[in-house]
Amino acid sequence: MKLVRTFLAFVVFLGACATLSGVDPEEWEGFQIFTNHHVEINVRFDSAEGRLVLNVFNDDNLTFYQPGESVFWIKDNHLFTLPTPVPDGLSTLGEPGDEIYLLPSSLASGDQERILHGMSGYGLGNNDLVEGTAPMILADVSGPGDVLLWLNSDEVYWDTGRPEGEFGFFENTPGGHHHRTWGFNRRGIHILTLETEGTVKATGQPAVTEATSFLYMIDPRSHEWWQLRHFGFEALKPHAALDHPSPANGLPNLISYAFDLDPHASSLAGMPRPEIRLSDDGKRRLALRHRRPQGDPEKETRSDLIYQLEGSENLHNWTPLEEGDENDYRLISNGEDDDGTPLLLAVLNETIEDSPYRFLRFRIVLNSQ
């Protein structure tokens, strides 16, 4: 019940915005990662070119950022439950009891763990456009789920449940600073493409505009960080899918992800390789040396993968093996690869003479949870 009450409070309450921690975004792989920041999608007018420009403004450090380098990371502390009944205007998000990711329009004093995300018109003057305001038009959305932006259930600005091309708009004001409630009903990578428009007051001509994309990581899984790192804003394209073979080395992206290989490089040097290990007892054991990336504790941990070691006598029939001193094999640390990636050895417990297996391989499984 607590989650439902919190959701309803966010729908109807628009209070003073809490001041957040005043920190810069985290830099990661060429991206600026916004998590618990006070940050807006901003529109400004470039009078020299008669152009309306969309960018990102961070209120915490009063700095503008390019959309192509900005990522909004929405963690699982934004997870809420839809109430019973779901207000009519919000039905696109799901059924009563469904979980959604909710970005609130305001934060309680002292809440520094969630994002405060809005719209602003810094750099847009009262006399720049004939219309005065500049609409933030949601032109397209790529991703696994739906997106809504609303003030209340009777005033929904964006709704991807509407027909394509009619998702809606939010009217941004000159110098404005607006916060509304956002809802995403699926985890994963979402890319929102926005457009704006207006008539230049000084010339009477339409302002030059272009579609601009903004990337949201909604409670992402580890492999989605890998896709972002290697494919950027093309992370949702077919060639970035885990089951897609890399044109550079022919490996499925899932294999490149599992062993932290560059999908754009032709080299296969980082693939697992067999070894004969001479143990402390003087006996030889078959082993498989492989990269086991650790990554950032909150990013590329490979926590969504299962590394299933399998053994075979003839390369035709394969048997799943269990890890453990009393089972089939042990995992032991084997230093680092040339790029610092941790190396592990999967070493059979039985000697070469006693083991029924002459060949080893890993079966990589993406955990569905």
Question: Where do the protein language model's features map onto the residues?
Answer:
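Hydrophobic/tyrosine-rich beta-strand signature of extracellular beta-sandwich/beta-rich modules
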Residues: 194-196, 362
